[in-house]
């Protein structure tokens, strides 16, 4: 007698485990999930990717406390000592020595006195610069007389030119053993004699070379990729136009030449906070993300924008749209921690987020 064939019974569902590598590829806001590599992440808050693993973000230790908002941390690197100052937005803006830490309140510049001179803008650009007389700080803020510090004493810096009101100097840089300064809302540059921290300056107007208009935004320095002994100084406009020079003396055609002229995305802010040195290169924060100046010289805008921050370019672009007008954008290199940090001010002087 034939028996009907039994239909196979389904077994119980079985789970399968699958291992994924740690997200060492970092945050990815560029690719779709289907095309994303398994080592990338769509959310990566307070985790830092390394070559082989991800590490949780470290906490922080309070170094100094004071009244007001710190708008510039100023570091003096002397021959024998390092000192830390904070430029504070308070009832009476001031620069305070925070080297020793703890509760600090005595102004070394500004304050209610004021000491040395009054400060109406605590947002400084500064450089460390050496002369035969020692190591100095040179500071400008586009609102007050420039300042200098010799490791012991703060004083007003005398930077003169017949066409210059020195309080209009908003950024500075060191190139070819000279101090360079930019005048706000112009394309006027001023430079001092070699190994000189103050005194009579020479004006260099480069406005006729910029085809997109605007005004000076940043002064950067970079070293040639093929010749490590060749340095360049680059001037960036508010429209993202870059003109680079090489040489040592702008007053001599034989020792000063235009080396490059190209377009990048507009810088997110003026002055030094938008850029930082990275080895022989210089990185600049723009509406296209963080770009390499050396790469920008040799590639087009789209190719360069896909480089350093290619995976988070959309996030940075969205942040520029939402927060671009706020003070607090900054690009900071942390060599000891092997990190490059982009600070985005989501609420001025009170909240921010950082891409690392």
Regions found by a protein language model. Give the residues of each.
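N-terminal beta-propeller domains
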Residues: 1-108, 168-245, 328-330, 335-356
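Beta-sheet-dominated scaffold domains
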Residues: 10, 221-356
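Trp- and S/T/G-rich repeat-edge/linker motifs of beta-rich repeat architectures
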Residues: 44-69, 91-124, 144-166, 195-215, ...
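Short alpha-helical segments and helix-capping/turn motifs at coil-helix boundaries
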Residues: 70-71, 78-79, 121-135, 159-177, ...
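Helix-rich alpha-solenoid scaffolding regions
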Residues: 108-120, 132, 136-139, 276, ...
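Internal, well-ordered domain-core segments that constitute the primary functional module
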Residues: 135-184, 188
């Amino acid at each position: 007698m034939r028996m009907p064939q039994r239909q196979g019974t389904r077994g119980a569902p079985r789970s399968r485990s699958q291992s994924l590598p740690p997200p060492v590829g970092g945050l990815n806001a560029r690719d779709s999930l289907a095309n994303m590599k398994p080592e990338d992440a769509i959310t990566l808050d307070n985790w830092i990717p390394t070559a082989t693993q991800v590490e949780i973000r470290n906490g922080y230790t309070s170094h100094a406390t004071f009244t007001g908002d710190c708008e510039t941390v100023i570091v003096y690197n002397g021959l024998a000592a390092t000192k830390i100052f904070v430029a504070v937005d308070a009832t009476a803006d001031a620069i305070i020595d925070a080297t020793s830490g703890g509760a600090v309140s005595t102004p070394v510049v500004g304050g209610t006195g004021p000491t040395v001179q009054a400060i109406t803008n605590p947002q400084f650009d500064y450089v460390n610069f050496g002369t035969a007389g020692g190591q100095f700080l040179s500071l400008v803020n586009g609102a007050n007389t420039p300042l200098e510090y010799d490791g012991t004493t703060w004083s007003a810096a005398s930077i003169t030119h017949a066409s210059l009101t020195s309080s209009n100097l908003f950024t500075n840089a060191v190139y070819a053993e000279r101090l360079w300064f930019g005048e706000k809302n112009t394309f006027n540059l001023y430079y001092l004699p070699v190994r000189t921290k103050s005194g009579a300056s020479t004006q260099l107007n480069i406005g006729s070379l910029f085809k997109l208009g605007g005004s000076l935004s940043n002064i950067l320095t970079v070293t040639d990729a093929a010749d490590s002994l060749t340095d360049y100084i680059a001037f960036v406009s508010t429209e993202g136009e870059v003109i680079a020079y090489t040489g040592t003396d702008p007053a001599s055609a034989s020792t000063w030449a235009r080396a490059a002229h190209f377009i990048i995305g507009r810088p997110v802010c003026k002055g030094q906070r938008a850029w930082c040195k990275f080895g022989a290169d210089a990185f600049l924060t723009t509406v296209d993300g963080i770009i390499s100046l050396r790469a920008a010289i040799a590639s087009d805008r789209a190719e360069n924008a896909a480089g350093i921050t290619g995976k988070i370019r959309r996030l940075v672009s969205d942040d520029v749209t939402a927060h671009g007008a706020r003070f607090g954008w900054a690009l900071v290199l942390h060599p000891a921690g092997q990190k490059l940090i982009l600070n985005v001010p989501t609420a001025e002087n009170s909240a921010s987020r950082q891409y690392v």
